[in-house]
Amino acid sequence: MATPTIKLNSGFDMPLVGFGLWKVNNDTCADQVYEAIKAGYRLFDGACDYGNEVEAGQGVARAIKEGIVKREELFIVSKLWNSFHDGDKVEPICRKQLADWGVDYFDLYIVHFPVALKYVDPAVRYPPGWSAKGDGSIEFSNASIQETWTAMETLVDKKLARSIGVSNFSAQLLMDLLRYARVRPATLQIEHHPYLTQPRLVEYAQKEGIAVTAYSSFGPLSFLELQVPNATNISPLFEHDVVKSVADKHGKTPAQVLLRWSTQRGIAVIPKSNNPTRLSQNLEVTGWDLEQSEIDAISALDIGLRFNDPIGYGMYVPIF
């Protein structure tokens, strides 16, 4: 069964479920992407900062070469890192990332964070991370979001990106962006799970015709190995009584319940797994529904707990 899609304001269809490439190891990335394509995944969510786009592209190339999928059947996402927000740096880095993936265009290219950092030449260090000097210090660029977005729009004009979007933006930043955007953002990617539901932001984006994609759908799980304090001090969502009881009732896994909690509300998800069974399970987002009372009960777990915060990684960039 084909994965359901969301119609973007750019006119393109985006799969409701994709495969996220954050923290996918370089030595296994190509195989994981290849296996995910075989399992039915068509959207792959990458980024400069993940440092594995070359390997992800190798997995894509293998699947295409073997006739498993055509390029036009895939939806490849990448992101503009903070160090490349200056207007004259956007297109060159996008072209580098396209070359890394081995493709001619991105289906979606996203501004990763609403913060411009000092430029780091890819020949010096790539990906550059948060610190221009690599010592944990933060140096900002003077590029405005408007300058960056104007350069992003040029990517659409030149057919390097079919759609462009933003990530980790607040409602206020979206409001400002929409005042001057010639090409409206097609998507907003945010941290979204029962511990951080951000209902007003989601509602505003959807009202403006901007599709919402949730990352870290399983809450603290992805952050435990990073030893983020918030993640180690909270009950895992997979073990929460509310989530477990709903899963038991429907004969589903807690992971499936958490993903359906998002997709049933029109929010796309980008989980990852190297387990073949879980790969397939994570695609099962149709054919069953949560009751509204169950959605409400899961949503009621919201405590405004954010895990993906630069400050949590020791980088003083107070964007949240």
Curated annotation (Swiss-Prot):
Keywords, comma-separated and alphabetical: Carbohydrate metabolism, NAD, NADP, Oxidoreductase, Xylose metabolism
EC number(s) on file: 1.1.1.307
Known pathway: Carbohydrate metabolism; D-xylose degradation
Sites where the protein binds NAD(+): 167-168, 216-225, 272-282
GO biological process terms, semicolon-separated: D-xylose catabolic process
Gene3D superfamilies for this protein: NADP-dependent oxidoreductase domain
Catalytic residues (UniProt): Y50
Positions bound to substrate: H112
Record's catalysed reaction(s): xylitol + NAD(+) = D-xylose + NADH + H(+); xylitol + NADP(+) = D-xylose + NADPH + H(+)
Gene Ontology MF terms: D-xylose reductase (NADPH) activity
Residues the UniProt record annotates as site (Lowers pKa of active site Tyr): K79
Leading EC class: oxidoreductase
Pfam families: Aldo_ket_red
PANTHER family tied to this protein: ALDO/KETO REDUCTASE
Function: Catalyzes the initial reaction in the xylose utilization pathway by reducing D-xylose into xylitol. Xylose is a major component of hemicelluloses such as xylan. Most fungi utilize D-xylose via three enzymatic reactions, xylose reductase (XR), xylitol dehydrogenase (XDH), and xylulokinase, to form xylulose 5-phosphate, which enters pentose phosphate pathway.
Family label: Belongs to the aldo/keto reductase family.
Protein name listed in UniProt: Probable NAD(P)H-dependent D-xylose reductase xyl1
Native source organism of the sequence: Aspergillus terreus (strain NIH 2624 / FGSC A1156)
Lineage: Eukaryota, Fungi, Dikarya, Ascomycota, Pezizomycotina
Gene: xyl1
